[in-house]
Amino acid sequence: MAFDGAWKIDRNENYDKFMEKMGINVVKRKLAAHDNLKLIITQEGNKFTVKESSTFRNIEIVFELGVTFNYSLADGTELTGNWNLEGNKLVGKFQRVDNGKELNTVREIIGDEMVQTYVYEGVEAKRIFKKN
């Protein structure tokens, strides 16, 4: 699948405003903007494994398409939701455990980049990754 491989963060668009809307304090936002995030994504059928390493943490997330699971963001925000394939996009629909508000995420390959788009409370941000 096109998502398979090692990806390294290249740049962000509107990420600070997005994090602010999420309620992340200014110090954590400044650090997160330079988190040196790397993702290693592998897919076997409907099962995905995402190894995430950054300045903040190293974790492995395993999920199956369409199956609800729990996930914690780097700042500790707890989410529940699932990922699905919609055409060539990996679409995540999550809900914050603390306030019930939706956080939607889309991963798609555009050219030689993986673009991860987040939408929360009407604020959209993008994190753009290059193959490592």
From Swiss-Prot:
Tetradecanoate binds at W83, R107. GO terms for biological process: fatty acid transport; intestinal lipid absorption. GO terms for cellular component: cytosol; nucleus. GO terms for molecular function: long-chain fatty acid binding. Hexadecanoate binds at W83, R107. Signal peptide: none annotated. InterPro entries: Calycin (IPR012674), FABP2 (IPR031272), Fatty_acid-bd (IPR000463), ILBP (IPR031259), Lipocln_cytosolic_FA-bd_dom (IPR000566). It is found in: Cytoplasm. Its main location: cytoplasm. It holds the Pfam family Lipocalin. Keywords: Acetylation, Cytoplasm, Lipid-binding, Transport. SUPFAM superfamilies: Lipocalins (SSF50814). CDD domains: FABP2. The modification N-acetylalanine is found at A2. FABPs are thought to play a role in the intracellular transport of long-chain fatty acids and their acyl-CoA esters. FABP2 is probably involved in triglyceride-rich lipoprotein synthesis. Binds saturated long-chain fatty acids with a high affinity, but binds with a lower affinity to unsaturated long-chain fatty acids. FABP2 may also help maintain energy homeostasis by functioning as a lipid sensor. Forms a beta-barrel structure that accommodates the hydrophobic ligand in its interior. PANTHER family: FATTY ACID BINDING PROTEIN (PTHR11955). Belongs to the calycin superfamily. Fatty-acid binding protein (FABP) family. This is Fatty acid-binding protein, intestinal. The gene is FABP2.
